[in-house]
């Protein structure tokens, strides 16, 4: 059986077209992406436990990676962006609801974001996250940016939770909604944020209503990468809510972290019935599938024996506006596999 590949972006495009949310957005600001005049500012938001006050909306935001960039696009905030940083291994950007926003926004680099790039772009805010751009080992942190007068907004999925460098402080979909509301407040587009959240909540509820339940729920493992030790999702990364709300039993739900590594022996012990492959990078989804199928320790794992492998795009699985569509997509795949 070939891996199931479902274009979740098409599900998302359909949902946004029905609601009027997405690349084309109208709102009380007149639909031009600029904040309304008046007494909205200053505003205070809480981001990863830190309260920050802004006297005006940032005008030259630099985003890092596809999910973060598309959060801005989903809110219609491309006119507030100096550009984005993203490798070119994150799928077909021409097929997403925000293709026009991609075309009008500068792709600053396909390599790693850094302080020099932010300075060259004259950024007033960098929207990234821990291990989504910010990294002490590389010397690129919010504290370093603050020294040169550049603000930061941390992706909520990446918030550190006090256990060393473990990440995650709330359920993944809640993290998405928190960021939409925070950015809605910061850029004075609260109505847009609430409309998107309502659309996503409706989409998730409809998918859950059709999802497998009870004893029919298959055990599901998310495979990102890695041969010696697999990189996977814990309870605080997007796949946890995507798998759970799609009608699966996430086998790594007890890991109180976001993206993390485990041992293959743990995977074998938990015997997933379905494996979801995260499709991105230099190693293709088919190459990942062939590795899983040929790796001797996995030979007796149910998902491998029955060839139950699903493929989702990277942007479906990290925190992004594509998460609700990925739930609907995976729910349909799980029903098909169980049928």
Can you annotate each of these PLM segments?
Residues 170-179, 254-255, 274-339:
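Structured C-terminal subdomain patch of bacterial secreted/periplasmic proteins
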Residues 1-71, 182-222, 333-339:
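Bacterial Sec-exported substrate-binding components of ABC uptake systems
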Residues 114-125, 140-143, 262-271:
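Short helices/loops that flank or line small-molecule/ion binding pockets
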Residues 232-259:
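Alpha-helical, coiled-coil/dimerization segments enriched in small aliphatic residues
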Residues 90-92, 132-140, 150-182, 215-238, ...:
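Extracytoplasmic ligand-binding site segments that recognize negatively charged/polar headgroups
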Residues 47-49, 105-116, 136, 255-263:
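Short helix-initiation/N-cap motifs at beta->coil->alpha
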Residues 58-59, 105, 129-132, 165-170, ...:
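Second-shell loop/turn segments in exported
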Residues 65-121, 125-126, 130-134, 251:
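A short, structured surface patch at a secondary-structure boundary
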